[in-house]
From Swiss-Prot:
Signal peptide, first to last residue: none
PROSITE patterns for the chain: RIBOSOMAL_L9
Name of the protein in its database record: Large ribosomal subunit protein bL9
Gene Ontology CC: one annotated term: ribonucleoprotein complex
Protein family membership: Belongs to the bacterial ribosomal protein bL9 family.
Region (Disordered): 150-191
Compositional bias annotation for Acidic residues: 179-191
Length: 191
Protein backbone atom coordinates (compact mmCIF):
# COMPACT_ATOMS: atom_id res chain seq x y z
CA UNK A 1 0.00 0.00 0.00
CA UNK A 2 1.25 3.49 -0.84
CA UNK A 3 1.09 6.00 2.03
CA UNK A 4 2.07 9.63 2.60
CA UNK A 5 4.11 10.01 5.79
CA UNK A 6 2.90 12.76 8.12
CA UNK A 7 6.07 12.62 10.24
CA UNK A 8 9.59 11.22 10.02
CA UNK A 9 9.63 7.50 10.78
CA UNK A 10 12.94 5.72 11.35
CA UNK A 11 13.92 3.25 8.62
CA UNK A 12 10.92 4.32 6.53
CA UNK A 13 11.19 7.93 5.40
CA UNK A 14 10.78 11.66 5.95
CA UNK A 15 7.60 13.69 6.33
CA UNK A 16 5.79 14.13 3.01
CA UNK A 17 7.38 11.17 1.27
CA UNK A 18 5.19 8.64 -0.50
CA UNK A 19 6.39 5.18 0.49
CA UNK A 20 5.21 1.64 -0.14
CA UNK A 21 4.54 -0.40 3.01
CA UNK A 22 2.80 -3.66 3.75
CA UNK A 23 -0.96 -3.44 4.07
CA UNK A 24 -1.02 -4.71 7.66
CA UNK A 25 1.60 -2.18 8.81
CA UNK A 26 -0.39 0.64 7.22
CA UNK A 27 -3.82 -0.47 8.46
CA UNK A 28 -2.77 -1.54 11.96
CA UNK A 29 -0.14 1.08 12.84
CA UNK A 30 0.49 3.99 10.47
CA UNK A 31 -3.10 4.97 9.65
CA UNK A 32 -4.70 4.56 13.13
CA UNK A 33 -1.90 6.45 14.90
CA UNK A 34 -2.08 9.33 12.43
CA UNK A 35 1.46 8.88 11.17
CA UNK A 36 0.40 8.44 7.53
CA UNK A 37 -2.40 8.89 5.00
CA UNK A 38 -3.32 6.67 2.06
CA UNK A 39 -1.60 7.95 -1.06
CA UNK A 40 -4.37 9.27 -3.31
CA UNK A 41 -5.07 12.62 -4.98
CA UNK A 42 -7.44 13.87 -2.25
CA UNK A 43 -5.04 13.04 0.58
CA UNK A 44 -2.10 14.52 -1.35
CA UNK A 45 -3.99 17.83 -1.64
CA UNK A 46 -4.95 17.62 2.05
CA UNK A 47 -1.31 17.03 3.03
CA UNK A 48 -0.10 19.98 0.93
CA UNK A 49 -2.69 22.22 2.63
CA UNK A 50 -1.73 21.08 6.14
CA UNK A 51 2.01 20.78 5.57
CA UNK A 52 2.97 23.96 7.44
CA UNK A 53 0.95 23.02 10.55
CA UNK A 54 2.40 19.49 10.49
CA UNK A 55 5.93 20.87 10.23
CA UNK A 56 5.26 23.31 13.09
CA UNK A 57 3.86 20.51 15.27
CA UNK A 58 6.85 18.30 14.45
CA UNK A 59 9.26 21.13 15.28
CA UNK A 60 7.46 21.71 18.60
CA UNK A 61 7.71 18.01 19.52
CA UNK A 62 11.38 18.01 18.56
CA UNK A 63 12.13 21.05 20.74
CA UNK A 64 10.31 19.45 23.71
CA UNK A 65 12.29 16.24 23.21
CA UNK A 66 15.52 18.24 22.94
CA UNK A 67 14.91 19.99 26.29
CA UNK A 68 14.37 16.59 27.96
CA UNK A 69 17.44 15.22 26.15
CA UNK A 70 19.62 18.05 27.46
CA UNK A 71 18.72 17.05 31.03
CA UNK A 72 18.87 13.26 30.53
CA UNK A 73 21.88 12.82 28.23
CA UNK A 74 24.72 11.03 29.99
CA UNK A 75 22.86 10.79 33.30
CA UNK A 76 23.23 7.63 35.40
CA UNK A 77 20.35 5.71 36.98
CA UNK A 78 20.64 2.98 39.63
CA UNK A 79 18.68 -0.27 39.40
CA UNK A 80 19.02 -2.60 42.41
CA UNK A 81 18.62 -6.33 41.73
CA UNK A 82 19.57 -9.63 43.39
CA UNK A 83 22.59 -11.31 41.84
CA UNK A 84 24.98 -14.19 42.40
CA UNK A 85 28.66 -13.93 43.28
CA UNK A 86 29.64 -14.02 39.61
CA UNK A 87 27.53 -10.95 38.86
CA UNK A 88 24.75 -12.85 37.09
CA UNK A 89 21.33 -11.39 37.92
CA UNK A 90 18.48 -13.50 39.29
CA UNK A 91 16.18 -12.21 36.56
CA UNK A 92 16.93 -9.31 34.24
CA UNK A 93 16.53 -5.58 33.71
CA UNK A 94 14.17 -4.84 30.83
CA UNK A 95 12.90 -1.63 29.22
CA UNK A 96 10.03 -1.54 31.75
CA UNK A 97 12.54 -1.46 34.64
CA UNK A 98 14.48 1.36 33.00
CA UNK A 99 11.27 3.36 32.59
CA UNK A 100 10.47 2.82 36.29
CA UNK A 101 13.96 4.06 37.25
CA UNK A 102 13.44 7.15 35.09
CA UNK A 103 9.96 7.72 36.56
CA UNK A 104 11.42 7.56 40.09
CA UNK A 105 13.66 10.49 39.10
CA UNK A 106 10.70 12.39 37.61
CA UNK A 107 11.13 11.67 33.89
CA UNK A 108 8.27 10.35 31.76
CA UNK A 109 9.19 8.25 28.73
CA UNK A 110 7.41 5.46 26.88
CA UNK A 111 8.64 1.92 26.39
CA UNK A 112 9.13 2.28 22.66
CA UNK A 113 11.60 5.14 23.25
CA UNK A 114 14.05 2.82 25.04
CA UNK A 115 16.30 0.89 22.65
CA UNK A 116 17.26 -2.29 24.47
CA UNK A 117 17.91 -5.20 22.11
CA UNK A 118 18.37 -7.74 24.91
CA UNK A 119 17.56 -7.50 28.62
CA UNK A 120 20.47 -6.71 30.96
CA UNK A 121 21.47 -9.88 32.84
CA UNK A 122 24.66 -8.87 34.67
CA UNK A 123 25.61 -6.30 37.28
CA UNK A 124 27.69 -3.37 36.10
CA UNK A 125 27.40 -0.17 34.13
CA UNK A 126 25.39 -0.46 30.92
CA UNK A 127 24.80 2.22 28.27
CA UNK A 128 21.25 2.41 26.91
CA UNK A 129 20.18 4.42 23.87
CA UNK A 130 16.88 6.30 23.92
CA UNK A 131 15.00 7.87 21.00
CA UNK A 132 12.96 10.73 22.46
CA UNK A 133 12.01 11.91 18.95
CA UNK A 134 12.78 10.63 15.48
CA UNK A 135 15.64 13.15 15.31
CA UNK A 136 16.68 13.23 19.00
CA UNK A 137 18.75 10.33 20.34
CA UNK A 138 20.52 10.19 23.71
CA UNK A 139 22.50 7.71 25.80
CA UNK A 140 21.96 7.10 29.51
CA UNK A 141 23.89 4.87 31.89
CA UNK A 142 22.14 2.14 33.87
CA UNK A 143 24.06 1.10 37.01
CA UNK A 144 22.82 -2.39 37.93
CA UNK A 145 23.95 -3.42 41.42
CA UNK A 146 22.98 -5.53 44.44
CA UNK A 147 22.62 -2.47 46.73
CA UNK A 148 22.89 1.32 46.66
CA UNK A 149 26.32 1.17 48.35
CA UNK A 150 27.54 -1.29 45.76
CA UNK A 151 26.22 0.98 43.00
CA UNK A 152 28.30 3.86 44.39
CA UNK A 153 31.41 1.68 44.48
CA UNK A 154 30.69 0.48 40.94
CA UNK A 155 30.31 4.06 39.72
CA UNK A 156 33.82 4.79 41.07
CA UNK A 157 35.18 1.98 38.89
CA UNK A 158 35.54 -0.91 41.34
CA UNK A 159 35.03 -4.48 40.14
CA UNK A 160 32.38 -6.28 42.19
CA UNK A 161 32.78 -9.92 41.18
CA UNK A 162 35.23 -11.09 43.87
CA UNK A 163 34.50 -12.05 47.49
CA UNK A 164 36.49 -9.04 48.72
CA UNK A 165 34.42 -6.67 46.62
CA UNK A 166 31.11 -8.24 47.58
CA UNK A 167 31.60 -9.08 51.24
CA UNK A 168 34.69 -7.10 52.22
CA UNK A 169 36.63 -10.36 52.82
CA UNK A 170 40.20 -10.90 51.67
CA UNK A 171 40.26 -13.94 49.36
CA UNK A 172 43.87 -14.75 50.33
CA UNK A 173 42.77 -15.38 53.93
CA UNK A 174 40.29 -18.00 52.72
CA UNK A 175 42.88 -20.37 51.27
CA UNK A 176 42.66 -23.97 52.62
CA UNK A 177 46.33 -24.14 53.63
CA UNK A 178 45.71 -21.39 56.20
CA UNK A 179 43.02 -23.48 57.89
CA UNK A 180 44.80 -26.82 58.02
CA UNK A 181 48.46 -27.70 57.88
CA UNK A 182 48.89 -31.51 57.66
CA UNK A 183 52.58 -31.32 58.62
CA UNK A 184 52.06 -29.34 61.83
CA UNK A 185 52.42 -31.12 65.18
CA UNK A 186 49.24 -31.45 67.14
CA UNK A 187 49.24 -30.15 70.71
CA UNK A 188 48.80 -32.86 73.36
CA UNK A 189 48.99 -35.79 70.96
CA UNK A 190 52.55 -36.94 71.78
CA UNK A 191 52.99 -40.72 71.92
Amino acid sequence: MQVILLERIAKLGQMGEVVKVRDGFARNYLLPTGKALRANAANKARFDAERSTLEARNLERKSEAQTVADVLNGKSFIVVRSAGETGQLYGSVAARDIIEALAAEGFTVSRNQVELNNPIKTIGLHNVTMHLHAEVEIAIEINVARSAEEAERQAKGESLTSADAIYGVDEDALRPEDFFDPDADRDGDDE
